[in-house]
Amino acid sequence: MRKRLALAGLILFGAWSGSADAQRPEWMFGPFVKPGQVNPIIAPNGAATFFSPMSDSVVRWEELATFNPAAVVKDGKVYVLYRAEDVTGKREIGFHTSRLGLAESSDGLRFTRRPTPVLYPDKDVQARYEWTGGVEDPRIVETDDGTYVLTYTQWNRDVPRLAIATSKDLVHWQKHGPAFAKADSGKYLKLDTKSGAILTRVQGNRLIATKVNGKYWMYFNVPDILIATSDDLIDWTPLADGDGKVLKVLSPRPGYFDSWLVEGGPPAIMTERGILLIYNAGNSGKFGQAGLPQRVYTGGQALFDAQNPIKLIARSDTPFIQPTEDYERTGQYKDGTTFVEGLVPFNGRWFLYYGTADSRVGVAVWDPKRR
């Protein structure tokens, strides 16, 4: 009872995450509220150390930044895998080494971290794709048999590549390499790919990877969102038109909050009204939404046909989450960021986990009963 009252109080005194809730279509999730007393929930930690097998030295692996989290519910707790950066490299976004840390929470708000990363560049067959930039920006889903499937970006400071890893316990991971390595004779290995949001169905507190028309589906990439299919969740093939050009299922719109770019967010979710895709959006200073800063990152929602995942039905006209708090505009990315990557149903509510200014992790909560 105390936990319930505490959460209710946090939501009551939290900050609204978006705008125009009265005009929110029925298919959209929200409104999400940012609990002010706990945010940011994960921040940089200069005391944590880790022996890097690649540099053969001890590094303070989460000293600079902790951000862009994936989330999953396991054994009655919320687990967050977050991107952590050390201070090596240039003082510039994308030029530090990233590793993935793991934290757990019994209430979805207060987290305890493991002292060392669970996924990192190692002296393995993926080293050529992951060193020296590291492993970035995870999203996670579960299979029917309890296997966890992680999409993440391999960054060797040359080409970012969307990759797959699997685990049974969230701690020990098997890397499977670039998601598109076997597609079209390997041509996608030379192209920038990232931000994979696999289609799921809700089963209790679990988001289970689900098939449509006999295939698994994944929305991915930036500045347009593309789509790929798979038979096994490991090897993926982007869909293309008759001319061999990849299909763009969601693109930027002049005059809107997503005028600069759109990028995959948390796992896509099958709902009664269709496939819900929460996505990240960037605003253009020249032809974007008036009143939003140039290059600010916000969040949007799109609805796709349940039987035809490439068919867009509707999309939001305004962001449902955007930088409003100091911690969302203070850090590596000062234009402001609410970069959504983790979404889980937990104890009757939806918890949305996001990166703030490429520096910290925030949470926003939606109670469907309050709609």
Regions found by a protein language model. Name each.
Residues 335-338:
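Low-complexity, glycine/alanine/valine/leucine- and proline-rich hydrophobic stretches
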Residues 18:
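Active-site glycine/GP-rich loop and adjacent strand/helix microenvironment
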